[in-house]
Amino acid sequence: MADRPRLPNNSSQTGKVFSRSSYPEYRRILSILRTETVGGALLLAATVVALIWANSPAADGYFALRDVKIGYEPWHLELSLGHWASDGLLAVFFFLAGLELKREFVAGELRKPARAVVPVAAAVGGVVVPALIYVLFNLGTAGETLKGWAIPTATDIAFALAVLAVINTHLPAALRTFLLTLAVVDDLIAIGIIAFFYSTGLQPLMLLAALVPLALFTFLVQKRIRSWYLLLPLALATWGFVHASGIHATVAGVLLGFAVPVLARGKKGEPAEGLAEHLEHKLRPFSAGFAVPVFAFFSAGVALGGLDGMGAALRDPVALGIVAALVVGKAVGVFGTTFLVTKTTRASLDSSIAWIDLFGLALLAGIGFTVSLLIGELSFGAGSAHNDHAKVAILAGSLISALLAAVVLRARNRRYRQVQADEERDDDGDGVPDVFARS
C-alpha cells in the first residue's frame, strides 16, 4: 500500500488560518488539553453528584452545605461555601486564564495580527450572536430577564475536551490550536463582561488599595521571584481588596495573571521554563482537578422537580433563550463569522481540515458551563427561580450541543487519524515530527 502524502506545514505561510503552530507550542497545547480533559471529567462527575444529591430525599443536606457560612465578618468575608467557590476558587481559574491570555498575545497564536484575526472574530461572533438570540427571546418579558443576556456567551473548554475524550476523536493540531485560541479569546471577553456589566456598588478606595499589593506582586514576578510565601499573601490581599471594591473578585485573578512575565530571560542560571510556565504547571492541576469541580458541585445543584419541573423551567423565556443561544447562536456565531472573515480576506484553510470540521468545533463551542453558571448567579442571584431555570437551560443546551458536535466530529474520525499519523511521523529520527520540521 502506498504511503499517504505528507501534509505540508503551513504555519509560516501567510494567508493560512487554522494552521499548525511550532512544535514547542504544539507540545504545550497538548499538555494543557490533557490536563483540561481530566478536569472536564471531574467537572462532569461533580455536576452529576450535585444534581443527584439536590434531587434526592437528602436534598436539604446539599443546600444546607452550600449555604454554610465561614470567614471573617469585619472584613466582609463571611461567605457561604457556594460563594467561596465562585468568588475564591474561580479566581485561580481566572488567574490561569490571565496567564494564557498574556502568553497568546506575547508569544502565541494571537501575537501576529494575520493569524489572530480569524479566531478573535470567531470568538466575538460566538458572543454577539448568542447574546442577540437570548435578547430576542426575552424582549416581551419583564426587564429583569434581560440581565441574563451574557449567560450563553461563554464556552467551557474543560467540558468540551471531556466530550472529545468520550467520543475518542483525534483532532488535528490545527483544530486543537484553534479550539484553545478560541477559548482564550472567549475567556477574555467573559472577563470584560463580568468586570463591566456585573460589578455593583463600586468602592473606589478599595479598588485603589488593591493596586498596592498588585504593584508589589508585579514587581516581584518581574524580578522572577517565585517564593510562594511572598507572592501568595500579596495575591490574597489583591483578591480581598478587589472583592471589597464591588468588582467581582475573579477579576483579581486575571489582573495577577497579566502581571506575570511569560518569556524567560535566558540568563545564566535561569530555569529552563519561564515564571508563567512554572506557575501554570503548579496551579493548573489544582484549578482543573479541584477548584472548578468544587465550583460546579456547589453551583450545578438544582431541584428539578421531575419531568414536570423540568418542563416548567424550560418554558421560562430565560431558559428558552439560553438553550437556543447555546445550540444555534454559538454555532452560527463561530462558524458564520469564521466563514465570512475567511471568504472576505486572503485567508484560506490549512490543508489538514475542512469546513465541516470547523462546524463541528462551532457546535462544540455551545458547551457553556463554568462561566455561564457564574454569570447566571451574577445576573439573577443564587437560589432565585430564574437562576435555577438558567442552570437547567445551561445543562440542556450544553448537552444538545455536545451531542450534535459528537455526531459531526465522530464522523470525521477516520480522516483525523490519518492526519494524526502524519503529525507523529519522524522519519529522520530527530525527535521532531517531520511535518513540524518543515518551514
Swiss-Prot record:
The chain crosses the membrane at residues 38-58, 79-99, 117-137, 148-168, 178-198, 201-221, 228-242, 244-264, 286-306, 321-341, 355-375, 389-409. One of its GO terms (biological process) is regulation of pH. Keywords: Antiport, Cell membrane, Ion transport, Membrane, Sodium, Sodium transport, Transmembrane, Transmembrane helix, Transport. Its main location: membrane. Residues 421-431 have a biased composition (Acidic residues). Residues 419-439 are annotated as: Disordered. One of its GO terms (cellular component) is plasma membrane. Pfam families: Na_H_antiport_1. GO terms for molecular function: sodium:proton antiporter activity. Disulfide bonds: none annotated. InterPro entries: Na/H_antiporter_dom_sf, NhaA. It catalyses: Na(+)(in) + 2 H(+)(out) = Na(+)(out) + 2 H(+)(in). It is a multi-pass membrane protein. It is found in: Cell membrane. Belongs to the NhaA Na(+)/H(+) (TC 2.A.33) antiporter family. Na(+)/H(+) antiporter that extrudes sodium in exchange for external protons. This is Na(+)/H(+) antiporter NhaA. It comes from Paenarthrobacter aurescens (strain TC1). The gene is nhaA.
